[in-house]
Curated annotation (Swiss-Prot), chains A, B:
Active site: residue positions: 139
Record-level Gene Ontology MF annotations: glyceraldehyde-3-phosphate dehydrogenase (NAD+) (phosphorylating) activity; glyceraldehyde-3-phosphate dehydrogenase (NADP+) (phosphorylating) activity; NAD binding; NADP binding
UniProt xrefs under Gene3D superfamilies: Dihydrodipicolinate Reductase, domain 2, NAD(P)-binding Rossmann-like Domain
Protein name in UniProt: Glyceraldehyde-3-phosphate dehydrogenase
Name of the gene encoding the protein in the UniProt record: gap
Source organism of this protein record: Thermoplasma acidophilum (strain ATCC 25905 / DSM 1728 / JCM 9062 / NBRC 15155 / AMRC-C165)
GO CC annotations on file: cytoplasm
Length: 338, 338
């Protein structure tokens, strides 16, 4: 049983904690929280709570939440830390992990240089093998790697051009905008293109990112120039053996991210999450070697299974297909075609 | 075991089906769907699917979904129908229920005259006892009845004035608006005031309804003139023995409906629902016999436990407190203070 500590229990940390706790080969040693808010109040039923340092303890005590110790205590009781602290904080935390000689996973908000390898289970599981510091790429990069990897493997890829319509913020955030404007990121390529190359080495890719006033999902319009001609059927077939890609057909009646997340609620999973990248099969269009498709990405959860697989790769306890199968089985990810 | 058929499997029908299936004293005999969409695709794993009439069968067969029969077949196999069809359709369906001599529950979109009694578990459980046709009032009316009933019981109520900031539509709907305007309902009182009197007989109440561009929850600003003076503590204390009222304190850090629904996701319930009416305890303000407070209402789910209790009242198999306890226990509704 790999002993996993979770430093940071926000959108990603909470979900990784739950996903790890569902696996047969790993357990959660505890979580680090900074505030005794509603998330801590619920979490304290399931997980041991640690704090960054002793100065945080009193607030938790006042709120009636038991604190087990500091992050150092959590590290001492763990074999790996998943650092899901806010963007940029992981870099500050790394010194501690190095000093205490503990493995660590960082999330996509950190720079690639923080880790020995960036990670996506489908496209480069092997590169994290036995590494001490690994970074799981962001939700958007994960999504692109998921659907592009099978195409690259089957047909080869000459060029990718993706337009990423980003959700403005997460559903629990009422501070950030925009609420009534569309906000393009004016430097092209957006940071997603180089980030994608950290898990799909040498990929020729450009990306444009545009923020839209929604909190539910990202939507990607992807254009791919393959190395050889394919048919629409070939493309869909290439995705068929990958459970983390979900086909959404015309009969499903799903035409928006609103319905897509409603579908996720029907699955009965933790937090009504949608781990799969949902590709509208109706949108898949092929002309010779040019493929276009549209996919929806649940930004809160698509990286969750990736974190679990990264742990297995770093401890060298399973190969890609076995790890992905174990993770998917516990998270109720099955191949679904709608 | 009471045999419950669900006619209409939209926002409310799906949730009532799940809630009924979790009880020890009732089972779901089947659900009626009109389209073989994503909801049907998932539902067919758990429930028998029926259709309004034979003309609907082919579409389901083409989508590979087994149809068990028509709504008449479902009625023949059931002891009660929960009619959660779209607003106004329940009235059309009632003839069939009368003809087939089956009990039926209607939802708040129907007119009160459709039923022998309107229903809220806290305020008038007894009025549905042994009745054949009962209407569970709408989400907003349910919410008002929940928090007003304990105040009326403890202090008496002279007058209520509530402003209802309504969510524009449900999260899975991308057709309706408004998306960027606030839309007051200009007739005062809004329909909620007379509706509330159907479950709180003789209550002196006025309501104003204003639509806001959000899909998450309704928010109510409630002002109550009690028959006698009270303190803030008295008011909160009056709610304390009611599990379906949840206290949200300042330490929780919850200041918006975004965080409120995020809290619900932490509970791990079906569809991440929030059955309780969430009252911000910080907002409770009392001056003599004048009380003000703000509450948030999850429009998709607050009526779900009410439907379960209405069934028990109609079959006269439990009194209010016993039914509510049974329902709450299976839906993981416990008294929570944040």
């Amino acid at each position: 049983m790999i002993r996993v500590g979770i430093n940071g229990y926000g959108t990603i940390g909470r979900r990784v904690a739950r996903a790890v706790s569902l696996q047969d080969d790993m357990i959660v040693t505890g979580i680090v929280k900074t505030k005794p808010d509603y998330v801590s109040m619920v979490a304290s039923r399931d997980f041991k709570i640690f704090v960054p340092d002793k100065s945080y303890e009193k607030a938790f005590q006042d709120a009636g939440i038991k604190v087990e110790g500091t992050v150092e205590n959590l590290i001492d009781d763990s074999e790996i830390i998943v650092d899901a602290t806010p963007e940029g904080q992981g870099e500050k935390n790394k010194d501690l992990y190095v000093k205490r000689r503990i493995k660590a996973i960082f999330e996509g908000g950190e720079e690639p240089e923080i880790a020995q390898a960036s990670f996506n289970a489908y496209s480069n599981f092997e590169e994290a093998r036995s590494k001490d510091y690994v970074r799981v790429v962001s939700c958007n990069t994960t999504a692109l790697a998921r659907t592009l990897h099978p195409l690259r493997e089957r047909f080869g890829i000459r060029y990718v051009d993706a337009t990423i319509v980003r959700r403005a913020t997460d559903p629990n955030d009422s501070k950030k905008g925009p609420i009534n404007a569309v906000e393009p990121s004016l430097s092209i390529p957006s940071h997603h293109a180089p980030d994608l190359r950290t898990v799909m080495s040498g990929l020729n890719v450009s990306t444009i990112a545009i923020k839209a006033p929604t909190t539910l999902m990202h939507v990607h319009a992807v254009r791919v120039e393959l190395e050889k001609d394919a048919s629409k059927n070939d493309v869909i077939e290439a995705w068929r053996s990958y459970r983390r890609i979900m086909e959404i057909g015309k009969n499903s009646g799903i035409t928006s991210t609103g319905q897509m997340m409603d579908l996720a609620r029907e699955f009965g999973r933790d937090r009504s999450d949608l781990y799969e990248i949902a590709v509208w099969s109706q949108s898949v269009s092929v002309q010779g070697n040019h493929v276009s498709y549209i996919q929806a990405v649940h930004q809160e959860s698509d990286v969750v299974p990736e974190n679990v697989d990264a742990i297995r790769s770093m401890f060298d306890i399973a190969d890609r297909d076995r790890s992905v199968s174990m993770t998917d089985s516990k998270l109720k990810i099955e191949k679904r075609v709608f």
